[in-house]
Amino acid sequence: MESGNVSSSLFGNVSTALRPEARLSAETRLLGWNVPPEELRHIPEHWLTYPEPPESMNYLLGTLYIFFTLMSMLGNGLVIWVFSAAKSLRTPSNILVINLAFCDFMMMVKTPIFIYNSFHQGYALGHLGCQIFGIIGSYTGIAAGATNAFIAYDRFNVITRPMEGKMTHGKAIAMIIFIYMYATPWVVACYTETWGRFVPEGYLTSCTFDYLTDNFDTRLFVACIFFFSFVCPTTMITYYYSQIVGHVFSHEKALRDQAKKMNVESLRSNVDKNKETAEIRIAKAAITICFLFFCSWTPYGVMSLIGAFGDKTLLTPGATMIPACACKMVACIDPFVYAISHPRYRMELQKRCPWLALNEKAPESSAVASTSTTQEPQQTTAA
């Protein structure tokens, strides 16, 4: 630990010697004051004009990320395990569910880099750590958005066209391959710095693609990645889930109208009422998924557009940590959406982890048979 302090002090002395403005006073220093000179070129100048945050802020964020990591890995690990191990859940549609949980899980694999940097007050792992952080973050972020879009497409087909829209294992595998092929060009371009690059942001403890360099190439890159990794998936998700919700409520309205014509209270039997409940849960889960996706990625999208095209002074180091926290928080919440809205997942989890005391009752066989088409969409909608 003592050698680490000596090293930090040495780098700090060299850095401030080359950048005298980095030390504002004995107590106040600019971000990057302790970064080795050869690493400074990888940091956008925008961040180097801000004073470093209090040590307690970095410690707080590091501790928060430890919590995010544990919660996400536990929750998504359970989802991957249960959906892969349970025969009743190994359906083609659920391959997409597993991939989404895998993306959320892998998103947190890189957080030890952030945690280490936070507890060492800055860019401690340097350019190599930044590249690893950026590669994993880009793959998981873009792949998660595309996976959500394909899940919405699959649910739309199964619910609105149950006879023609059935998913097969071949289709699901092809979608997964396409998702990672779709993400790869963006990652390779940034890693090789042929178009864009991975750079530290905020408190210099996390990394993302460069949205601050003031040139045409950077602005074009930001516009393209924003469109293809955010606008396209968001448009698909919004369209397909809105169609699902519209279909469910149109179906309910048609049944009510027919019941009125026949002077009966309801056309549904007890089995149909179970199906009705499932349909309402589909609608609620669809809205929840849309909301979570928007909450997690809209702040990042807005921030990158401001950096490339707007007033950069709005992007303070503290403000840019908020979008990063939003993404990690949603990666923690997603598994609990499964647990709340997917009875079959809850049943399988209860079998394997009885100590969780989920108390999920097995559905009646008649209800299961009648709602097989409905529950299958419900599984992936909860993704």
From Swiss-Prot:
It comes from the Eukaryota. Coiled coil: none annotated. Glycans are attached at residue 13. The chain crosses the membrane at residues 58-82, 95-119, 134-153, 172-196, 221-248, 285-308, 317-341. Phosphorylated on some or all of the serine and threonine residues present in the C-terminal region. Residues 362-383 are annotated as: Disordered. GO terms for molecular function: G protein-coupled photoreceptor activity. One of its GO terms (cellular component) is plasma membrane. It is a multi-pass membrane protein. Pfam families: 7tm_1. The modification N6-(retinylidene)lysine is found at residue 328. Visual pigments are the light-absorbing molecules that mediate vision. They consist of an apoprotein, opsin, covalently linked to cis-retinal. This is Opsin Rh3. It comes from Drosophila melanogaster (Fruit fly).
